[in-house]
Amino acid sequence: MKLRLSTDEMLSQWRMRRALEPLRSDCTVERIDGIDLDSFLKMEMRDWYLNLLDTAPLHLLTLTDITSKISLSKNDDLSATIRLPQGCRRVIELTLDNSPSPVKITTPDTPLAICQQNPFCQSGAVSPIAIHSNNSLIIHAGSDNFNIVQLLCVMEPDEGLYELDEAALSLISQIP
């Protein structure tokens, strides 16, 4: 089941799964020179969540279709560029109207991406590719006569929200 948790709700889950709660209530100790444990845990929790968005299996994440939020600009070399919206962590699937299969998404340092610099090795409409770099996608599809049908991404939610599948909470490790 997909969850949408506030920072306080996620912090409560984080404390329980890291074995920091329930607290002992049979004694009280008060210190004024200690660390702000909640701030430390929130920072640790945020780092864990951003790593989850970047690396977790897709069934643990919420996918967003951002097709309506993007614009396509044509380049001189029959490629096209899409500027991705702020907060796009991962591009999952891109579908074009003139292609029988989804676009293969790669990074600039792969051999497939490097081949796109040679006009004799570039991808065509049958097997288009998109190079994901610096919040943009450069699409090589053999022509610039295409439209985007669907663009699925993992988006970072608004500040203070955590969107994930309930099963992802099991990935929170206890403090050793």
Predicted ranges, named:
Residues 1-128, 132-176:
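Glycine-enriched, solvent-exposed interface loops adjoining structured elements
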